[in-house]
């Protein structure tokens, strides 16, 4: 949906589809792979030969098709499946990709073939503070019979405090992974 005009004072956004009032909103600009990916020449091409704006990588190993020793993870990764397109652009996905790439590099260093590691994605949404309530969505991936990644989505929309606590544990693990602590 193309943004025509944003009025943050009156909290109205105007689009080709109409005007929408909002209480709170997050607006995100155009996304694309990081500058380094462009400089490396790792951006893929669309069917008509134009830049895809995303790194062209193997859908399971995240390495470049032209150089299997160069890996790209996280938000810069392009489409990996005809079923769902891109992995979600999330910290959880980048974390899981990073873990699996570390394993792949270790396997390469030992002269072993890379063994695919199927990542997942998990997103908690803290929806209320009084009482504490959260919901979640989980994405699982597997290789389909035709050699394409398949995605299964599980929505957990039953609001409850246990999911809030699970989110805090998840966050703690992400911090440990990030800091090495």
Name these PLM-found stretches.
Residues 1-11:
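A conserved short coil-to-beta-strand element within the FAD-binding core of flavoproteins
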Residues 3, 14-19:
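A structured beta-alpha segment of the ubiquitous adenosine-cofactor-binding alpha/beta core
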Residues 21-24, 28-94:
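FAD-site-proximal beta/loop scaffold in flavoenzymes
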Residues 53-72, 117, 127-147:
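FAD-binding beta-loop-beta segment adjacent to the flavin cofactor pocket
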């Amino acid at each position: 949906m193309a943004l025509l005009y944003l009025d943050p004072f009156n909290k109205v956004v105007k689009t080709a589809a109409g005007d929408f009032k909002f209480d709170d909103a997050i607006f995100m600009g155009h996304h694309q792979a990081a500058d380094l990916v462009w400089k490396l020449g790792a951006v893929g091409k669309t069917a008509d030969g134009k830049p895809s704006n995303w790194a062209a990588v193997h859908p399971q190993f995240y390495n470049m098709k032209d150089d299997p020793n160069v890996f790209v993870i996280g938000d810069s990764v392009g489409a990996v499946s005809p079923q769902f397109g891109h992995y979600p652009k999330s910290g959880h996905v980048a974390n899981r990709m990073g873990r699996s790439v570390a394993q792949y590099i270790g396997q390469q260093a030992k002269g072993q073939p890379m063994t695919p590691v199927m990542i997942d994605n998990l997103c908690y949404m803290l929806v209320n503070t009084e009482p504490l309530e959260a919901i979640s969505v989980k994405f699982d991936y597997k290789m389909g019979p035709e050699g394409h990644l398949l995605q299964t989505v599980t929505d957990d929309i039953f609001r409850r405090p246990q999911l809030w606590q699970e989110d805090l544990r998840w966050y703690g693990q992400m911090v440990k992974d990030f800091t090495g602590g």
